[in-house]
UniProtKB/Swiss-Prot annotation:
<keyword id="KW-0325">Glycoprotein</keyword>
<dbReference type="GO" id="GO:0005576">
    <property type="term" value="C:extracellular region"/>
</dbReference>
<feature type="signal peptide">
    <location>
        <begin position="1"/>
        <end position="19"/>
    </location>
</feature>
<feature type="binding site">
    <location>
        <position position="175"/>
    </location>
    <ligand>
        <name>Ca(2+) 3</name>
    </ligand>
</feature>
<dbReference type="GO" id="GO:0005783">
    <property type="term" value="C:endoplasmic reticulum"/>
</dbReference>
<feature type="binding site">
    <location>
        <position position="121"/>
    </location>
    <ligand>
        <name>Ca(2+) 2</name>
    </ligand>
</feature>
<feature type="domain" description="EF-hand 4">
    <location>
        <begin position="188"/>
        <end position="223"/>
    </location>
</feature>
<feature type="domain" description="EF-hand 3">
    <location>
        <begin position="151"/>
        <end position="186"/>
    </location>
</feature>
<feature type="domain" description="EF-hand 5">
    <location>
        <begin position="229"/>
        <end position="264"/>
    </location>
</feature>
<feature type="binding site">
    <location>
        <position position="164"/>
    </location>
    <ligand>
        <name>Ca(2+) 3</name>
    </ligand>
</feature>
<dbReference type="InterPro" id="IPR018247">
    <property type="entry name" value="EF_Hand_1_Ca_BS"/>
</dbReference>
<comment type="function">
    <text>Involved in regulation of vitamin K-dependent carboxylation of multiple N-terminal glutamate residues. Seems to inhibit gamma-carboxylase ggcx. Binds 7 calcium ions with a low affinity.</text>
</comment>
<dbReference type="GO" id="GO:0005789">
    <property type="term" value="C:endoplasmic reticulum membrane"/>
</dbReference>
<feature type="binding site">
    <location>
        <position position="246"/>
    </location>
    <ligand>
        <name>Ca(2+) 5</name>
    </ligand>
</feature>
<feature type="domain" description="EF-hand 6">
    <location>
        <begin position="265"/>
        <end position="300"/>
    </location>
</feature>
<feature type="binding site">
    <location>
        <position position="117"/>
    </location>
    <ligand>
        <name>Ca(2+) 2</name>
    </ligand>
</feature>
<dbReference type="Pfam" id="PF13499">
    <property type="entry name" value="EF-hand_7"/>
</dbReference>
Length: 315
């Protein structure tokens, strides 16, 4: 059972840092590409299909006729129209694309859900999570494995409260997803930065200096000479990370490092799909406009929409 995801992540980080001193640990979170294919609508729409449905889902479209594709695309459109006003806006399309690209995250949450939802009420309370994750450890105030579980639990509780949007100490699936994968949510970015700084800031001054920055990536105890990438990272810190040149990174500088403002591929694709399909140029799409351009969205392919719609309903 996957009942201790954060504990396992912590333990793996420790092993990583101590067992492979020459390998670089990367804390930077980048968005995955929408598709591995070229975006060339002059040749085909495969990139758009992958972006709209997710690359794995798009592979299962091959056996559907155009009529079946249009029918099932119509059902998808109803799901995208979040406010049910009969139109699909660029923002709604962007949100759908982002969700399609995060399928692996939702699958991970789904696998863990049943282990924590002890009373089967389709919610996970902090007490449920705490009891499953830390119950046996808290019975021993001084475990011999070197981990401070009370400290780790307090950190998890702080993150849980941040993910719990309505403050009821109970998480629905979207809130629990934000708890397990905070880097994917705008309102959770501050907690990602805070946890990163707590991990790296060894002297407790609230900043990350050069030696702490390098020490987090590289364990030099067993080596005479530093690998070349370490020297490069020292330069990166001085030239780019430490923007105000005070010799350390503050919260804003740390956020720029680990959560860079990457090019928003989902937004660009949403703009592209609206531009190509919006025949009356009112800035939003009707179901008819989307179905008229079904080849752009799904072509003569389509996902196993029965499965897809059930999965998206759950979230």
């Amino acid at each position: 059972m996957e009942i201790r995801p954060l504990l396992m992540c912590f333990a793996l980080c420790v092993v990583y840092a101590t067992s492979k001193p020459t390998e670089k640990k990367d804390r930077v979170h980048h968005d995955a590409p929408l598709s591995s294919k070229e975006h060339d609508d002059g040749t085909n729409f495969e990139y758009d299909h992958d972006a709209f449905l997710g690359e794995e889902e798009a592979k299962t479209f091959d056996d559907l006729t155009p009529e079946e594709s249009k029918n099932r695309l119509g059902k998808i459109v109803e799901k995208i129209d979040a406010d049910e006003d009969g139109f699909v806006t660029e923002a709604e399309l962007k949100a759908w694309i982002k969700k399609a690209q995060k399928k692996y995250i939702y699958d991970n949450v789904e696998r863990q859900w049943k282990d924590f939802d002890l009373n089967n009420d389709r919610m996970i309370s902090w007490e449920e999570y705490k009891n499953v994750t830390y119950g046996t450890y808290l019975d021993d105030p001084e475990p011999d494995d070197g981990y401070n579980y009370k400290q780790m639990m307090a950190r998890d509780e702080r993150r849980f409260k941040m993910a719990d949007g309505n403050g009821d100490h109970i998480a629905d699936k979207e809130e629990f997803t934000a708890f397990l994968h905070p880097e994917e949510y705008e309102h959770m970015k501050d907690i990602v930065v805070l946890e990163t700084m707590e991990d790296i800031d060894k002297n407790g001054d609230g900043f990350i200096d050069l030696e702490e920055y390098i020490g987090d990536m590289y364990n030099h105890e067993d080596e005479m000479d530093e690998p070349e990438w370490v020297a490069t990272e020292r330069e990166q810190f001085s030239e780019f990370r430490d923007k105000n040149k005070d010799g350390k990174m503050d919260r804003e500088e740390t956020m720029d490092w680990i959560l860079p403002a990457d090019y928003d591929h989902a937004e660009a694709e949403a703009k592209h799909l609206v531009y190509e399909s919006d025949t009356n140029k009112d800035g939003k799409l009707t179901k008819e406009e989307i179905l008229n351009k079904y080849d752009l969205f799904v072509g003569s392919q389509a996902t196993d929409f029965g499965e897809a719609l059930v999965r998206h309903d759950e979230f």
